[in-house]
Amino acid sequence: MWKQFGKYFNKYPKRRKIAQKLLEYGLRIENKSIYCGKIMLSDSKIARALEVDRRAIPATVAMIQKNQSLNKVFSKLTPTCHLKDVAPEMKWGVIEIIPEDPSIPGILAGVANIVAKSNLSIRQAIVDDFELSEEPRLYIVVEKQLPGILIPKIRDVKGVKAVVIY
């Protein structure tokens, strides 16, 4: 995805950083403002969190809204609740997959198939976009702790480099 949009930000490294974080967190642009769901976020707090000048935030928003291709995407982003850190509190299991090459198709399908054959329900599966994340991962939250016997089977899935269970 970033390959399509990165070219618009080549001359503006701070705007690139801001746009990447908007994508990463699912923050939407609407009416010259940035939203997390229906909650409008302040430019100054976003700037502080991203360690950029406050003026770079509205400049990035204006740039995105002026470009039809960018605006079509950034106006439709939605934040997502990631359950991996909550899972242990709920007595759920988490499978973290480190891929050999994140562009290899079928990693999620292969792991999900093993989980399903073990009669475990998947609560959530989140895959980091390999164009946005330096070290993309696949996280699968399952209804209970994963039996250790499944780890070698998951490691054997094509494209899996390593498996972390917690």
Task: Set out the residue ranges of the language-model regions.
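Residues in the recognition helix of alpha-helical DNA-binding motifs
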Residues: 60
